[in-house]
């Protein structure tokens, strides 16, 4: 039987009871697979790796070594949440790497989107490789592979969930407890494992993080404005009950300035663009109609609370022709 093929008889996980049954099965399977050996996991804080981490902690405890690399392009509070949930609440064997300076120094002056993506991906591999090399006795690699990953690669998973490991990075085997699950099932399992809703229901987030929303060459001050404006948007959408109604939303701070005025003086500050979309397949997206009072409140907060910003815009572009992300 192909271990990468979901059995036709496998019931869709839609309830806490089905999730608990799945968790029990996977705990037994993982214990049988790894025995008393150590397992390594790159923990991004995303849905898939977080659910795998929580499940493996339940199965093998301190035998799991989680490595979280903060590349400086995370949303506000995300790395702190990983430390709080996994390092403190779940008492995980967590290795936290703050590589912010390393990544931002590499990205300095780089404006071309694909080049930025490549630098971020390659640097992640180097950091993960260096830190993993310091660990002893690692026998298995765990990954947050899910079933759509397998389907999209015609049943042959490239296993690049940790950024693309070098060919000479040898393990006895891969531990992929959620590889036959769809995304909605992974979320149900995550909730059954007790992970916080904001982590389990996390929106899609590009691999390069905020690097593709801070368009052009990334600067620390503009990245700060992006992170703060994004946090305000999320907070206000949450208060308005929009978080569960909109598929994805975020802010963008482009590499341009706009003329503003304050205390009678001209300013050359950045614009902030609000992007919100609804979609079923991510191929065709519509832009939701947001209540004017909500947009006005978000605008006022961003202009008053975020340094260096003088203008807020709402992106009305559907896909196609515009992509969801700006880069």
State each model region's role.
Residues 1-139, 148, 154-327:
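RNA-binding accessory domains that recognize and position tRNA/RNA substrates
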């Amino acid at each position: 039987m192909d271990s990468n093929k979901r059995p036709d008889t496998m019931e869709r996980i839609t309830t806490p009871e089905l999730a608990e049954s799945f968790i029990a099965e996977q705990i037994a399977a993982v214990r049988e697979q790894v025995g008393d050996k150590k397992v390594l996991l790159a923990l991004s804080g995303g849905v898939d790796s977080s659910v795998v981490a929580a499940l493996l902690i339940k199965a093998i405890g301190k035998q799991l070594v989680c490595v979280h690399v903060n590349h400086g392009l995370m949303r506000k509070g995300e790395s702190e949440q990983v430390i709080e949930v996994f390092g403190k609440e779940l008492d995980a064997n967590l290795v936290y790497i703050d590589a912010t300076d390393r990544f931002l120094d590499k990205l300095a002056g780089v404006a071309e989107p694909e080049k930025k993506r490549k630098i971020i991906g390659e640097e992640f591999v180097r950091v993960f490789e260096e830190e993993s090399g310091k660990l002893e006795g690692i026998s298995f690699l765990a990954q947050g592979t899910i079933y759509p990953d397998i389907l999209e690669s015609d049943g042959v998973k490239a296993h690049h969930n940790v950024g693309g490991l070098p060919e000479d990075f040898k393990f006895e085997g891969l531990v992929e407890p959620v590889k036959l699950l769809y995304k909605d099932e992974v979320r149900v399992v995550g909730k059954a494992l007790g992970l916080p809703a904001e982590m389990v229901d996390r929106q899609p987030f590009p691999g390069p993080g905020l690097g593709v929303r801070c368009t052009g060459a990334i600067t620390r001050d503009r990245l700060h404005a992006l992170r703060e404006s994004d946090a305000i948007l999320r907070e206000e959408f949450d208060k308005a009950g929009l978080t569960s109604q909109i598929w994805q939303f975020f802010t963008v701070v482009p590499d341009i300035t706009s003329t503003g005025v304050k205390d009678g003086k001209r300013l050359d500050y950045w614009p902030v663009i609000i992007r919100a979309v609804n979609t079923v397949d991510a191929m065709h997206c519509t832009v939701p109609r947001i209540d004017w009072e909500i947009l006005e409140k978000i605008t006022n907060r961003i202009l008053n609370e975020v340094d260096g910003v003088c203008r807020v815009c709402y992106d009305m572009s559907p896909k196609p022709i515009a992509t969801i992300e700006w880069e």
